[in-house]
Amino acid sequence: MELVLKDAQSALTVSETTFGRDFNEALVHQVVVAYAAGARQGTRAQKTRAEVTGSGKKPWRQKGTGRARSGSIKSPIWRSGGVTFAARPQDHSQKVNKKMYRGALKSILSELVRQDRLIVVETFSVEAPKTKLLAQKLKDMALEDVLIITGELDENLFLAARNLHKVDVRDATGIDPVSLIAFDKVVMTADAVKQVEEMLA
């Protein structure tokens, strides 16, 4: 199959298996959920009655005071006591096979092509690391919410995009399923397309 280059009177021949396969919603959902789960810190922690600060002495004798019996000031029902079922640091990551991950990326890229959300250009750069230059370039292309993927990370482009809302710049090795879905449009250079094809082959 061929992808039309927007900034040149030509087309780029690409693999049907990468840019023209059926959309596997279940696979994409599984991979996106796993990717998001892997981004969770999982560092929450609370103290049990064994970990809170306090004496181990029985507050008062068992019988004869008229008060409810009590064995520790660290009891969960006491103020400043431990938590009954204390949260523990947790690893939320989910295992995803390489074949599944690549399959999900191919599904997403193919769907972007079908929805006309993927724009392929020969080159994409700015002369200087100026936000104004990139903003004007995107305005000329009628783009606002956009992910720009280049073959190699362009320093000028990266710096120019840092202060633009809903604009992100990545190199071909930095793509992920969540980012591809999150933006309205995805701009890829011809070099990036070739690199992605090789990565997902």
Curated annotation (Swiss-Prot):
It comes from the Bacteria. It comes from Enterobacter sp. (strain 638). Residues 44-71 are annotated as: Disordered. The keyword Ribonucleoprotein applies. Part of the 50S ribosomal subunit. Belongs to the universal ribosomal protein uL4 family. InterPro entries: Ribosomal_uL4, Ribosomal_uL4-like, Ribosomal_uL4_dom_sf. GO terms for cellular component: ribonucleoprotein complex; ribosome. GO terms for molecular function: rRNA binding; structural constituent of ribosome. This is Large ribosomal subunit protein uL4. GO terms for biological process: translation. Gene3D superfamilies: 3.40.1370.10. One of the primary rRNA binding proteins, this protein initially binds near the 5'-end of the 23S rRNA. It is important during the early stages of 50S assembly. It makes multiple contacts with different domains of the 23S rRNA in the assembled 50S subunit and ribosome. The gene is rplD. Keywords: Ribonucleoprotein, Ribosomal protein, RNA-binding, rRNA-binding. The keyword Disulfide bond does not apply.
